[in-house]
Design a protein with these regions (language model features):
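Short acidic, glycine-rich surface-loop motifs adjacent to enzyme active sites
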Residues: 76-94
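Histidine-centered catalytic micro-motifs
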Residues: 84-90, 120-128
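Extended active-site neighborhood of metal-dependent phosphoesterases/phosphodiesterases
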Residues: 1-77, 97-98, 102, 106-119, ...
Length: 179
């Protein structure tokens, strides 16, 4: 229930999820980073078609979110732009390939359109992966979790992969975005 997560922000100062998709700019010592948070579930066809398991995805207008993303990226002037979604665009996984193909079909044209996205970060498959596709300026980062770790192996473009649990830390200045 996505609405429950948004409502929880009204009772806890430590939780902030103002909408199903939103953006936030972090500015520190003159370096600005725009983080764009997406709800990727409605971007996957099989989720939108399964009202019993994914009722939130069935009710959402995926095209409205994609239009919002396009407009947000068009106007993004920060030093760095990171897009965050739950589902991977590229990754080694035993999960259904159609999920990644749907993400590639819907997100990649927009992410590449303004040439300003540095990283697409996600989770969903419970391991670490850093993928750089040849000819693509975006780094694709899959984050693990602390509750479950799944096996992983390199795919085309893999820079790093590990089944360890944990999280990623990013630091930035005007010249470099480091992970």
């Amino acid at each position: 229930n996505t609405q429950a997560f948004m409502d929880y922000g009204k009772v806890s100062r430590r939780w902030m999820m103002p909408a199903k998709y939103y953006t936030k700019v972090f500015d520190h010592k003159g370096t600005a980073i725009r983080v764009i948070f997406l709800d990727t579930t409605p971007l996957i066809d099989s989720y939108r078609k399964n009202q019993e398991i994914y009722p939130d995805a069935c009710k959402q207008d995926a095209e409205a979110q994609l239009s919002w993303l396009d407009e947000t990226l068009k106007n993004a002037k920060e030093d760095w732009v990171i897009v965050v979604g739950h589902h991977p665009i590229y990754a080694y996984t035993t999960k259904k390939e159609n999920e990644r193909l749907d993400m590639q079909k819907r997100l990649l044209p927009i992410l590449h359109k303004y040439n300003n996205v540095a990283i697409y970060a996600c989770g969903h498959i419970h391991n670490f992966q850093h993928i750089q596709k040849k000819g693509d300026n975006i780094d694709y980062v899959v984050n693990s979790s602390s509750s479950l770790a799944r096996p992983v192996k390199p795919i085309d473009g893999t820079v790093f992969c590990s089944p360890a649990d944990g999280f990623s830390v990013f630091t930035a200045d005007k010249k470099q975005l480091r992970m």
